[in-house]
């Protein structure tokens, strides 16, 4: 059997971080088992499902690197209405579905009664049964189509995350599978799609647990082999509450990209939200695929920890090739009005500073002083700069100007003799030198920094 999983987002304007975690686990499960990962766009909400909102999903999937095996044949529900109507007609013909003519007022009365009695909402008055007389069909009423849910027994499955789950069928309504205007409903469309796509494992959020028994009964009615189900726990914000855009939480996956998070780090972090491989916190996507097993997913909710996300991101920045980092940082430098990054070569700069930042924006900031002296912080000036330091910098500039070879070793070899002559420790030279050349007291080894900045530029900055 070829394992087939799917990710089925609805285009709502952004790709939710929780959806990406679901997609990641589905993708990793398929890749681990050498199977297929499929994408389906559940776009039946025509008011919200614009081309732009669909592209946001596709772009988000591309950014995080979750490739899908039906890229040339993505399933769109709006293109499958004829298929849904065909299956509904089959269910009606077999007696597994029926027309219901209840008015809104009748349904509301049933709902109130059910809440009081703790029973299923719909009283099944239009459900055909042997020996039962149905009400007279009202004039001018367009019926909905309901699925004929079994009245006895239980619907159960062994959830790949939550374990054994059992729901009494008497607790289930006769689900509406087609509205009065003929459009099919979510649960029905999802069942038909999963059946036609050959999905073997449905991995999704645990907010779908209550949908599962309804979908299982429909699958049985159409004669399908049942897939296995795994329901993932919710992701909570740092306060332990449901992630919400209204609460100021970052929820769109593209927003994390704007924050300077690498896609590989995002996947690494999301993988650790609910799944564990021993004490491993930092790993590559390839390692995650190799290690991933749903039995290692906790059924308990996971809590966001942005501090840990940034730490993981910093670790991924360290192992990212300098050439790749260059392409990621260059546009961020352009936003900071640094457009010429050939002298010094940005790739060389990044090789020196990439272990000093935990996101790409901070990394771009770390590169600025190589191209333009920054305005020093008042606290640094007060601590490391005075008239004596200024005079000392001019004297050291003369030593630098005398160098024939401009490299880190040659610059470093000037430090000790100069400090001995001045009767000072290295800090009295290094910190003012950083301020004079870079505009900050926090840099990598100052000889390496000066070596990357040209001799002419270093002397110009010191003597400015």
Swiss-Prot record:
Q: Where is this motif: 'KMSKS' region?
A: 242-246
The protein's enzyme class: ligase
Q: Where in the cell is it found?
A: Cytoplasm
Q: Which residues form a coiled coil?
A: none
Q: Where does ATP bind?
A: 245
Identify the GO cellular component terms for this protein. cytosol
Assembly, in brief, is:
Monomer.
Kindly give the HAMAP family that the UniProt entry links to this protein: Glu_tRNA_synth_type1
Q: Would you tell me the protein name for this molecule?
A: Glutamate--tRNA ligase
Q: Give the organism, scientific name.
A: Neisseria gonorrhoeae (strain NCCP11945)
């Amino acid at each position: 059997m070829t394992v087939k999983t799917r990710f089925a987002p609805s285009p709502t304007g952004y790709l939710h971080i929780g959806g990406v975690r679901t997609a990641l686990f589905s993708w990793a499960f398929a890749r681990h088992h050498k199977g297929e990962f499929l994408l389906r766009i559940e776009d039946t909400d025509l008011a919200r499902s614009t081309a732009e909102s669909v592209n946001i999903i596709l772009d988000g999937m591309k950014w995080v690197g979750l490739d899908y095996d039906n890229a040339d044949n993505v399933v769109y529900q709006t293109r499958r209405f004829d298929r849904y109507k065909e299956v509904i007609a089959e269910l009606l013909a077999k007696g597994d579905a029926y027309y219901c003519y209840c008015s809104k007022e009748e349904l509301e009365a049933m709902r109130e009664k059910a809440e009081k009695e703790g029973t299923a909402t719909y009283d099944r008055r239009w459900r055909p049964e042997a020996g039962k007389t149905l009400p007279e069909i009202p004039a001018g009423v367009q019926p909905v189509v309901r699925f004929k849910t079994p009245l006895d027994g239980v619907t159960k499955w062994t959830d790949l995350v939550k374990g054994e789950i059992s729901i009494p069928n008497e607790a289930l309504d006769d689900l509406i599978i087609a509205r009065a205007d003929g459009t099919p409903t979510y649960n029905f469309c999802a069942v038909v799609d999963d059946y036609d796509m050959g999905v073997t494992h449905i991995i999704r959020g645990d907010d779908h647990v209550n949908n599962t028994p309804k979908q299982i009964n429909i699958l049985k009615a159409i004669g399908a082999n049942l897939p296995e189900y795994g329901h993932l726990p919710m992701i909570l914000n740092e306060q332990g509450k449901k992630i919400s855009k209204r609460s100021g939480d970052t929820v769109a996956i593209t927003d994390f990209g704007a924050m300077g998070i690498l896609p590989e780090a995002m996947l690494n972090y999301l993988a650790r939200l609910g799944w564990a491989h021993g004490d491993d916190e930092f790993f590559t996507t390839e390692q995650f695929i190799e290690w991933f097993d749903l039995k290692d997913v906790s059924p308990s909710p996971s809590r966001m920890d942005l501090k840990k996300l940034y730490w993981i991101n910093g670790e991924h920045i360290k192992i990212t090739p300098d050439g790749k980092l260059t392409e990621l940082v260059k546009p961020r430098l352009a936003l900071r009005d640094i457009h010429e990054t050939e002298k010094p070569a940005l790739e060389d700069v990044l090789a020196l500073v990439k272990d000093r930042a935990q996101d790409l924006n901070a990394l771009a900031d770390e590169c600025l002083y190589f191209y333009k002296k920054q305005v020093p912080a008042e606290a640094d000036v007060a601590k490391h700069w005075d008239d004596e330091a200024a005079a000392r910098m001019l004297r050291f500039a003369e030593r630098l100007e005398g160098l024939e070879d401009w490299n880190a070793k040659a610059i470093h070899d000037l430090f000790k003799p100069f400090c001995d002559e001045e009767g000072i420790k290295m800090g009295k030279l290094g910190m003012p030198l950083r301020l004079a050349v870079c505009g900050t007291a926090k840099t990598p080894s100052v000889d390496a920094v000066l070596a990357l900045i040209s001799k002419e530029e270093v002397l110009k900055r010191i003597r400015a």
